[in-house]
From Swiss-Prot:
The complex is composed of two ATP-binding proteins (SsuB), two transmembrane proteins (SsuC) and a solute-binding protein (SsuA). It catalyses: ATP + H2O + aliphatic sulfonate-[sulfonate-binding protein]Side 1 = ADP + phosphate + aliphatic sulfonateSide 2 + [sulfonate-binding protein]Side 1. This is Aliphatic sulfonates import ATP-binding protein SsuB 3. Belongs to the ABC transporter superfamily. Aliphatic sulfonates importer (TC 3.A.1.17.2) family. The gene is ssuB3. Residues 17-238 form the ABC transporter domain. It holds the Pfam family ABC_tran. The keyword ATP-binding applies.
Length: 270
């Protein structure tokens, strides 16, 4: 298995994504409507919107957990399904197996001499010294770091994040944001982050996409240097622009987004 530090340069590049005329309906309810989107290789994109707007459905389609009703999902010019081995997904829950030690959770499903790479992945997220502990001994933030290490060991070119920081306290959340941003800069994968937190979106993403009632309502480039100064006037202005647009959407209580049961075999961060 190739070490994270020894990846050939072409593997340090993210996957370019193209979403064309995408629709997703559950019965008579159309959740996504004619989504067209191009994401360059290595871009960090945050997807925001009210609950039930369709953002998590979009991520599930990109992850291959659901199939579009209409439209195409492409990795460059090839079907996105061809890039599943290069794709990893993280959820709000770390989904660690409590009967396996931390390092074994990172190497879950791998064969051969995977332990050095698992330890290297844990080192990348700052948890190498906890490798032989049980998940129950970890905090919520540490468990998410393990889930991130479990994704990194597979050298992903596309990382899909479905509100992985939503259950963390404010300080731990900022630390995890900074870690994800650092690793993204180091490894160059393409990132799509679904989040309810607009401040999080503008703080770490290159681009913020607002989903309104199943359509793209705003596509905002965050053209600010990194690392970004939290609380700066320019960052606050961008956050206000997105929030004002979100709050301008009629606030009738949305239906929860439908979803299909998870398949038995799933490449989340494992």
């Amino acid at each position: 298995m190739t070490s994270l530090k020894q990846q050939p340069p072409h593997l340090l590049r993210g996957i370019p994504l193209a979403v064309q005329n995408l629709k997703k309906a559950f019965g008579t309810r159309e959740v996504l409507k004619d989504i067209d989107l191009h994401i360059p290789a290595g871009q960090f994109v945050a997807i925001v919107g009210r609950s039930g707007c369709g953002k998590s459905t979009l991520l599930r389609l990109l992850a291959g957990l659901d199939k579009p009703t209409e439209g195409q999902l492409l990795a460059g010019s090839a079907p996105l399904d061809d890039a599943r081995e290069d794709t990893r997904l993280m959820f709000q829950e770390a989904r660690l197996l409590p009967w396996k030690k931390v390092i074994d959770n990172v190497g879950l499903g791998l064969g051969g001499n995977w332990r050095p790479q698992a330890l290297e992945a844990l080192e990348a997220v700052g948890l190498a010294e906890r490798a032989n502990e049980w998940p129950a001994a970890l905090s919520g933030g540490q468990k998410q770091r393990v889930a991130l290490a479990r994704a990194l060991i597979h050298k992903p070119r596309l990382l899909l994040l479905d509100e992985p920081l939503g259950a963390l306290d404010a300080l731990t959340r900022i630390e995890m944001q900074q870690l994800i941003e650092k690793l993204w800069g180091q490894y160059g994968f393409t990132v799509l982050l679904v989040t309810h937190d607009v401040s999080e979106a503008v703080a770490i993403a290159d681009r913020v996409i607002l989903i309104e009632e199943g359509q793209i309502g705003l596509d905002l480039l965050v053209d600010l240097p990194r690392p970004r100064a939290r609380g700066s006037h320019r960052l606050a202005a961008l956050e206000a622009e997105v929030l004002n647009r979100v709050l301008a959407i009629p606030g009738s209580p949305p239906d929860p987004e439908p979803f299909s049961p998870l398949p038995t075999q799933l490449s989340w961060a494992n």
